[in-house]
Amino acid sequence: MKPFPRAEISSSALQNNLAVLRQQASSSQVMAVVKANGYGHGLLNVAKCLNNADGFGLARLEEALELRAGSVKARLLLLEGFFRSTDLPLLVEHDIDTVVHHESQIEMLEQATLSKPVTVWLKVDSGMHRLGVTPEQFSAVYARLTACKNVAKPIHLMTHFACADEPDNHYTQVQMQTFNQLTADLPGFRTLANSAGALYWPKSQGDWIRPGIAMYGVSPVTGDCGANHGLIPAMNLVSRLIAVREHKANQPVGYGCYWTAKQDTRLGVVAIGYGDGYPRNAPEGTPVWINGRRVPIVGRVSMDMLTVDLGHDATDQVGDDVLLWGQALPVEEVAEHIGTIAYELVTKLTPRVAVCLA
C-alpha cells in the first residue's frame, strides 16, 4: 500500500537532467549539488540515481559522511567548508574536499596535525559579498595556502554568482571578469556556474559546473520552467482525496471562514497540510492536479488538510490521487501562486512525507 502524502522521485528524470546539463556544458565536469537532503528528494536516493555524476556538492560534513557511509565514491565538496578543527581528520579519512572562504579556516589548517593534506577550493568573493576572500585579500591568502603543508596542491578556485538567475543582469559578467582576472594563469580547477550559470551563461561553465535546482528538473529563473530546457521534474508530490462533500452557495469552509462559495459546488478534502510542509499561506486559487485537470485550493491550508473546489459536476471520488506539484503541474507554477520560489517548496517537506523512488 502506497503511503500518502508521498514524494515520488523519478530516477529517469534525474538521469535526463544530468544528460541535459552535460550537453549544455560539454567541456565541464558536473558536481551535482545534493545539499538539504538532495533538495528534498532524499540525499542518498539522489546520489545513487546520479552515480555517473563526477562529484557532489554538500553544505554540511554530516551530509558528506552519509554519502560515504552509503558507498558513494565520487568527489565530495563541502560548499561552506569545514566549521571546526575536529572536522579536518574526517575530511582526510573520508577523502572529502573543502571550500576555504575565511581566515579562521586557514588558521585551523595551519595548526592541524594531519596524516595527509586536504584538497581545498579557495572561494573568491567576486561580488556576492556573502562568503569568500576579497580581491584585495586574494594574493596573500593564496600564498598562505600554498605554503601550508596541510593543503594539497594545486589549490582549486571557485566563486558564486549573485544574479545569474537574471539573464539580462550585467552583474554576472562583472563577477566573471573579476574572478578570471584574479585567477589567470594559476593551476587547479575552476568552478563558477550554478544552475543558472550552466543554463544561461555559457562562458561561466569552467572546469566544473555546480547545478542544484536544475538537477531536479526545475528552472532557477522566475517565470521560466525547467521543461523549456528539456529538464523533467524529478519529484511528484502526491496525496489523495479523503472526502468529497456537497457544498451550498454562500457556505464558508475552513478556519476563519476565509472562503465562501458563490454557487453550489463539490469540495474535496486533500490529506496534506502545513504539517507536511505545504505552505499555510497558499492563497485561494493555488492549483492542484486531480484526474487530468487543475482545480483551485479554497479556504485556509490547515495542519493536515487542504480543501479544493472540484466543481458542481465533478465525479472525483474519495481515494483519488492528488498531485500538489510535479510533471503535470510544475512546481515553478505553484511557487509563483504562493509568492515564493520552487527551492523553498521542495526543501521544506517534513518527515511526514514519505520519499519514495518511483
Swiss-Prot record:
Kindly list the GO molecular function terms attached to this UniProt entry: alanine racemase activity; pyridoxal phosphate binding
Q: What EC number(s) would the UniProt record show? A: 5.1.1.1
Can you tell me which residues bind substrate?
130, 303
So what does this thing catalyse? L-alanine = D-alanine
What's a GO cellular component annotated to this UniProt protein? cytosol
Which cofactors are required for activity? Answer: pyridoxal 5'-phosphate
Tell whether Nuclease is among the UniProt keywords.
no
The protein here is known as Alanine racemase
